[in-house]
């Protein structure tokens, strides 16, 4: 390394060098007590083929190694190794390939590393990293957040040393702009903008969807300043996003080193594209998955299942999937002599001839979804040990404890009196092969999808086959579980020329590679819908697109704690938002969610939005392909589509479904306020044109969810709603268009990439259609239309109030 002259350090710390131990006090935003240390000044640096390395002296006289690696021209990796020590385990989520050598220069006060667009400036003394994008400062580390006594309120980038001298955590502290906002962190339900919040990423069985305890926390967030950060670890992470200081935020990992990626792009869509280009994008899911899923916990036998299918047909609803939770032998069956030993088999006493049942469902246009969890029942309340536990333990396929025996624990948060389970070890290749073979068997029978439930509660003292601990792999476990089941499903489905998906509860950074997800156990209450939407928006900004929630709410209790069906309005509002979400599954805990058990008003409201969704399937599927190509979520926060509008930065009560449709679900608000960004919008309920760039008060109607068509955009729709989705390209479409002057929009179907253009000028409307099977247009024009041309050929049209039919 090239050595750098030692600076006069004392001048930078006039009040701290004499009493450094005072740095320990008052740091409530850190999770560990101990001696804090931080990077002080550079002593040497060395150019690397893909970045630059630094030897840095710390405040307490130790040394640290800092490696900077560029992974694209606008993204880099920051690694800090205290005491110059390589860790026992680099517990990384991703190891992105380097993108080539930056230009590294030494200047009088700085070392700089530069790509075509990104420049990192490292101050020699005191250590400080500044990030510039296209010649302008984007962000920088915070090195001077002090109290009046000149003691640090937020300590600069550094680490904590325990009593035995080992490093027990590491942290980064960044400057926070006065108006900076933060989004993401996975499926966090409690707030949209995380400024001023504490966030911990540690998967838990949340048992609700209205707090920041979540099934799918992710150590990834996006800043309104034009960058995003992924803490590149599976270990528990903590984020103090300005909760204890209005000028700094801190990221902490319980690793003995620091490892994160920073992506730089002033366009929030660009940030998601950049992140998913490296971390992965979802493969396309089956077309039928965009239909309606019917479920309850649970249909208990084949006769009941087939009765529900018959009732759905009689009711006239459009539906494509039915789900069974309790399809396997009862848990008790594994505790009797000669009881069940293998996993994932039908209980043929309750579901006789499962192959015949699946074939019968297929003939009726219905796919089958089945529940699973990644545990085996170990010990029942009477202390008996299950046959499955013995079998899996004998094969060495269970996660162990410190004593080398299978680690037994309660499967849910706080379930101390529940049946005890042991976890399948997805780091063991033997177990992975076994589970894949069991899943492939089900897929080849014709099962459509597996619901991968649970996986969040592995204890920290667990020991895995690959040698990692519960601290290191607790967050990784849900991802390994999803990966195993998804890969098995995909491999089997590809043999049959079909697409695959999961219906997964838990996950982590990178979950978009194993679609899809649902929000977990949600309440039926109307105000809880807002929490669900917040979770959906946050996980979308974290790279996950194919997402839904339990329509009707998974649970609902009366004042005595008894389970009851939701009230009509609770059910209706949930149905409306759920059917205008990326994926739509109705599900409930023991009480029914079938629409016919509710009032006539609720039934009509259900059918109205159910049929509208099915008419919109070409739009939804095309938007799904946009996710696959670009990583942009289907359910989009308003700031994604309108990043330059400051009004959108904190809106979490509405969203864009794709780029054309604004959805403003009704919760429990006394008055329903909707923000319409710039342009003029078409109210799809009334056909009225409404000027934007303002808030409006929308009249609440029980059968209406406000939907608005964006200016200069279109929605491809089916003319009639089918009962089921066929596995073929959509045909005979109607394009619903809101045109002011000029627009161009892509359309995608399997193997089809079409383009639609519209130009309105001097009362002449020119429509250009390429590779879109359209037979009718419904045109909402902002001006007078006297002539219409389609692909340069004059076309007849009629006027019906607010729109033209062509």
Name each region found by the language model.
Residues 64, 109, 127, 216, ...:
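Residues that flank catalytic or metal-binding motifs in active/ligand-binding sites
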Residues 75-76, 119, 128, 219-220, ...:
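Beta-sheet entry/capping signal
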Residues 81-83, 90-93, 134, 318-606, ...:
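Aromatic- and carboxylate-enriched substrate-binding clefts and catalytic-loop regions
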Residues 486-492, 500, 507-517, 539-549, ...:
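Catalytic core of carbohydrate-active enzymes
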Residues 295-297, 305, 311-314, 320, ...:
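C-terminal substrate/ligand-recognition segments
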Residues 185, 195-198, 214, 305-306, ...:
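Short, hydrophobic/amphipathic alpha-helical packing segments
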Residues 1-283, 287-288, 297, 302-310, ...:
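N-terminal accessory segment at the very beginning of proteins
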